[in-house]
Amino acid sequence: MAVDTANEVKAIARYIRMSPSKVRRVLDQLRGRSYREALILLEFMPYKSCEPILKVLRSAVANAEHNQGLDPTQLVISQAYADMGPSLKRFRPRAQGRAYQIRKQTCHITIAVAPQV
């Protein structure tokens, strides 16, 4: 299945409070699939990360429809990746006056859609 990368449209969600590795687990399932297939998969996957990914996917398709005038039924996910965002640093009190650092990870989710040729 060939994809027209010249008309690629993307959407980005930044500072999502989730580990990038957990988001990548879902994105790896979506890459290369059609928009309709991806919607069905995201609806029934049992992962917490599906919700923000679904929002980004819908945003990318809305961008393609509004800005480029593309047909949503012809769109394929050409790129899908999650990059590391800044970590929120928290401390957990431990015995004898010590404290351990806890890093709450964030990520940036990017999804690009392109029409099928």
UniProtKB/Swiss-Prot annotation:
One of its GO terms (biological process) is translation. GO terms for cellular component: cytosolic large ribosomal subunit. InterPro entries: Ribosomal_uL22, Ribosomal_uL22_bac/chlpt-type, Ribosomal_uL22_bac/org-type, Ribosomal_uL22_CS, Ribosomal_uL22_sf. GO terms for molecular function: rRNA binding; structural constituent of ribosome. PROSITE patterns: RIBOSOMAL_L22. Keywords: Ribonucleoprotein, Ribosomal protein, RNA-binding, rRNA-binding. It holds the Pfam family Ribosomal_L22. Belongs to the universal ribosomal protein uL22 family. PANTHER family: CHLOROPLAST 50S RIBOSOMAL PROTEIN L22-RELATED, LARGE RIBOSOMAL SUBUNIT PROTEIN UL22M. Part of the 50S ribosomal subunit. This protein binds specifically to 23S rRNA; its binding is stimulated by other ribosomal proteins, e.g. L4, L17, and L20. It is important during the early stages of 50S assembly. It makes multiple contacts with different domains of the 23S rRNA in the assembled 50S subunit and ribosome. This is Large ribosomal subunit protein uL22. It comes from Synechococcus elongatus (strain ATCC 33912 / PCC 7942 / FACHB-805). The gene is rplV.
